[in-house]
Design a protein with these regions (language model features):
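Basic/polar N-terminal segments that are highly enriched at the extreme N-terminus
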Residues: 1-7, 701-703
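Active-site core of metal-dependent hydrolases
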Residues: 10-125
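Active-site proximal loops enriched in glycine and acidic residues that flank catalytic Cys/His/Asp
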Residues: 47, 71, 100, 282, ...
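Hydrophobic/aromatic-rich, well-ordered segments within soluble, folded domains that form packed cores
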Residues: 64, 68-70, 291-307, 333-334, ...
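Short linear, low-complexity motifs centered on an aromatic residue
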Residues: 76-92, 109-112, 117, 215, ...
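Glycine-rich, acidic/polar active-site loops that bind/position phosphate-bearing ligands
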Residues: 125-314, 323-326, 333-570
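Composition- and surface-driven signal marking solvent-exposed, interaction-prone regions
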Residues: 218-219, 294, 316-317, 343-347, ...
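C-terminal amphipathic alpha-helical interaction region
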Residues: 502, 507-703
């Protein structure tokens, strides 16, 4: 029998929680820290010194030797620089371990080597990290030792945001301020803030590490750039929610333990649709903590997979022909006195506050559909969105039958008199209970779906930080709340004004509501008639960051300056170009050094066989036909490889980042597809024993 695991005991054991602060800090200091966490404010240096000492003592007791300001630059992953707690030895030669309040609050990493989109020159190296007091410090432990990690924001010497956390925190304050205006209108005077909560469902693939190391494309690009489909894929629908293999289950068990220690509320785990694909979902938490924890989830997945002889693939589309991976971003708003603004109750037609919030969100999503799409755009996501496995690239909102009916009543008559109820689900079996049925079904094809008391934004890519989608969501909803509050706060008769405004918003923005099949061609045509944007690539999406509408939105709430937005647009173009360039160079390398030589060797064997059969006086028609077919495909692959190299050479003459990104999308990417096609066809024709890399069957079924 395996050892009994005490989850309550290990949960948060590597986190400097409020509970540990309460135990270790003087009462007055703890109260000051708690007040700042709850309501904002600046920590005095004297208080920071006390907190730093308590934090250091706790970390050292748990084996830590170093600390780091843990931040999230515009690379999309985390960054850290480790500093030891050591100082100069005293007169007796004894080492003194210190950590000051100043070191806790502020760090100075080199800002010149991170993406800045022109905000910083190479010689302008100074950058600052600032402690995010609302996200608890934690310990990371691996073969390098134990490190105290302090979540921080990252900005330039001039104050520009150089990370993903700073805009997120700004957006959280913006939506809280504007949402408070809304709840005040309905008589809630107790709430002091409105909190954006997030729960990201993380999808991923696991492959055997030995096989992974034999694929250059997986190593350099994170996805397979070549690969014929295996005879069996996901068509039997037998992997989704299927029995978890013991090797995978062992990985999941260790992953859960590591995450629980880090305070991550890992709750749900299961097999996903594609072979070798799985999912982990946590419980919801405050948006910035959810962002931090999701970064820890992705990092921990990779580490734990390595211990089990596997590699975790987080790319949105590691294998062609089977489902890719996403990260469903469940988002909601709640007051600090326990009111979920997205809870419609049993009779949403009577819940005027909910209807106003819903109308504002529909207005926000419709007005800024392009910007919301951009927030989830990514090089890898281009391969996933719009296929019959993921939400379409067209933003629409699924409300379900109950809310759609309420909206219809309000638009047509200005009044909603009833709400469809769920009723009972009769199982028809005497030993099974009859079940309370929800008032609406779910729609897995919708990119932005209402799911009972939250919205699920399903376009986000599996490898992406969830900071940008939530920054954008918070910002666009803050704007809609602000405009509504501006009108209603001046109204002579609030009841009449709020009903009129709800009807106005729903009427003007009902085009964004779609409860049907988002995968269908009919929806693509219908969306075009409705005037909804259909942004199909990261390059096209990047342009939306710097439209007049977007700049006005972000500047109004102090989330981004125009300079910060333009820098991010440039970084996105550069990231796209660099990513496709790496993929293209990898394809060239694999084609020239692996595939073409292997096939040439095989054709030599076939040619020898043809000669041997003919010399024996036998019929060599079959051998000759096979040799001819393979030789023709080999020539096609060789020509495509040469063409791809030629296209890559042309990029050297394109200096404009935007034009270069479009060239990679329209020209280089097409040349990559042209090379993949004959190589994949050759894989189906050549003896498996001589094929130079593990196949799809090897990778996704042998793990």
């Amino acid at each position: 029998m395996s050892e009994v695991l005490n989850v309550e005991e290990i949960f948060g054991s590597k986190v400097f929680t409020l509970g540990k602060m309460r135990e270790r800090l003087p009462k007055s200091i703890y109260k000051e820290v708690k007040k700042i966490i709850d309501h904002g404010g600046e920590l005095s240096l004297a208080t920071a010194d006390v907190v730093a000492k308590a934090m250091k003592d706790w970390a050292i007791e748990n084996g830590a030797t170093h600390y780091t300001h843990w931040f999230q630059p515009l690379t999309g992953i985390t960054a850290e620089k480790h500093d030891a707690f050591v100082t100069h030895p005293d007169e007796s030669g004894k080492m003194i371990m210190e950590f000051s309040g100043k070191e806790l609050i502020k760090g100075e990493p080199d800002a010149s080597s991170f993406p800045s989109g022109g905000l910083r020159a190479t010689f302008e190296a100074r950058g600052y990290t600032a402690w995010d007091i609302t996200s608890p410090a934690f310990l990371k432990e691996d073969a390098t030792g134990v490190i105290l990690c302090i979540p921080t924001a990252f900005c330039s010497y001039k104050g520009e945001a150089l990370d993903k956390k700073t805009p997120l925190l700004r957006s959280m304050e913006a939506v809280s301020t504007q949402a408070l205006r809304i709840v005040r209108l309905f008589g809630n005077t107790e709430a002091t803030k409105v909190v954006a909560s997030v729960g990201p469902e993380q999808e991923y693939f696991l492959v055997d590490r030995d096989k992974y190391l034999k694929r250059e494309d997986l190593i350099f690009a994170g996805r397979t750039l070549f690969g014929a489909p295996a005879p069996k894929g996901q068509e039997l629908e037998d992997h989704y929610f299927g029995t978890i293999r013991e090797r995978i289950g062992s990985f999941m068990k260790d992953l859960n333990i590591e995450l629980w220690k880090l305070g991550v509320t890992a709750k749900t785990q299961h097999n996903e649709v594609a072979p070798a694909q799985h999912e982990l979902a946590p419980i919801y938490e405050t948006a910035n903590i959810a962002v931090d924890h999701n970064q820890l989830v992705m990092e921990t997945m990779k580490k734990v997979a390595g211990r089990h002889g596997m590699t975790c693939l987080l790319h949105e589309k590691p294998f062609a022909g089977v489902n890719g991976s996403g990260k469903h971003n469940n988002w909601s708003l709640g007051t600090d006195n326990g009111v979920n603004l997205l809870d419609p109750g049993d009779t949403p037609n009577e819940n005027i506050q909910f209807l106003l919030v819903l109308a504002c969100i529909l207005k926000a999503v419709d007005t800024h559909a392009d910007l919301l799409s951009q927030s989830a755009s990514d090089v890898g996501n281009d391969h996933r969105l719009g296929a019959n496995e993921a939400p379409p690239a067209i933003i629409s909102v699924f409300l379900g039958e109950q809310l759609e009916d309420v909206v219809k009543q309000l638009v047509e008559t200005g009044d909603a008199t009833h709400s469809i109820q769920g009723g009972k689900l009769l199982t028809g079996v005497s030993t099974l209970p009859d079940l309370d049925k929800d008032a609406t079904d779910r729609n897995r094809t919708s990119p932005f779906a209402f799911t009972g008391n939250k919205f699920e934004f399903r376009m986000v890519g599996s490898a992406d930080s969830i900071a940008s989608p939530n920054t954008t969501l918070n910002a666009i909803v803050a704007e809609a709340f602000c405009e509504a509050a501006d009108i209603l706060e001046k109204a002579d008769d609030f009841d009449i004004a709020v009903h009129d405004l709800i009807k106005k918003y729903l009427t003007e923005h009902q085009r964004i509501i779609f409860n049907g099949n988002g995968y269908s061609e009919e929806w693509v045509e219908e969306a075009a008639k409705r005037g909804l944007p259909n942004i199909k690539s990261m390059v096209e999406a990047s342009e939306t960051l710097t439209t007049e509408k977007s700049i006005k939105l972000f500047e109004k709430f102090g989330i981004f300056t125009e300079a910060e937005l333009r820098s991010r647009e440039e970084i996105l173009y550069e990231t796209y170009s660099k990513t496709i360039n790496i993929e293209a160079l990898t394809m060239v390398d694999m084609a020239k050094k692996q595939y073409i030589p292997a096939v040439m060797e095989y054709t030599k064997t076939l040619a020898d066989t043809v000669l041997a059969v003919k010399s024996a006086g036998a019929d060599a028609t079959v051998q000759t036909t096979v040799l001819k077919s393979i030789s023709e495909k080999l020539a096609e692959a060789q020509a495509a490889e040469t063409s791809l190299e030629d296209k890559l050479a042309e990029t050297a003459g394109i200096e404009n980042p935007k034009k270069l990104a479009f060239f990679y999308k329209d020209v280089v990417h097409t040349a990559m597809d042209d090379l993949r096609t004959p190589v994949d066809e050759l894989e189906m024709m050549v003896d498996k024993k001589v094929w130079p890399v593990p196949t799809y069957g090897d990778l996704i079924f042998e793990v």
